[in-house]
Amino acid sequence: MSIIFQLVLTALVFFSFVMVVAVPVAYASPQNWDQSKPLLYVGSAIWIGLVLLVAILNFLVV
């Protein structure tokens, strides 16, 4: 269970770095906003899901 927690936490950290770069780029390009909007929503949902999964696994591991 500890290895699963570490893998999910690592995925959250890497995905957070990707979102830190991707979100400002998507907001800075107004001509591609219609194409970027669904990706931002999906990325935000994945990030929230990873945060909740880390919280649940943290409760189970510790």
Curated annotation (Swiss-Prot):
The keyword Transmembrane applies. The keyword Thylakoid applies. Keywords: Membrane, Photosynthesis, Photosystem II, Reaction center, Thylakoid, Transmembrane, Transmembrane helix. Pfam families: Ycf9. One of its GO terms (cellular component) is photosystem II reaction center. It is found in: Cellular thylakoid membrane. It is a multi-pass membrane protein. InterPro entries: PSII_PsbZ, PSII_PsbZ_sf. One of its GO terms (biological process) is photosystem II stabilization. The chain crosses the membrane at residues 8-28, 41-61. May control the interaction of photosystem II (PSII) cores with the light-harvesting antenna, regulates electron flow through the 2 photosystem reaction centers. PSII is a light-driven water plastoquinone oxidoreductase, using light energy to abstract electrons from H(2)O, generating a proton gradient subsequently used for ATP formation. PANTHER family: PHOTOSYSTEM II REACTION CENTER PROTEIN Z. PSII is composed of 1 copy each of membrane proteins PsbA, PsbB, PsbC, PsbD, PsbE, PsbF, PsbH, PsbI, PsbJ, PsbK, PsbL, PsbM, PsbT, PsbX, PsbY, PsbZ, Psb30/Ycf12, peripheral proteins PsbO, CyanoQ (PsbQ), PsbU, PsbV and a large number of cofactors. It forms dimeric complexes. NCBIfam families: PS_II_psbZ. Belongs to the PsbZ family. This is Photosystem II reaction center protein Z. It comes from Crocosphaera subtropica (strain ATCC 51142 / BH68) (Cyanothece sp. (strain ATCC 51142)).
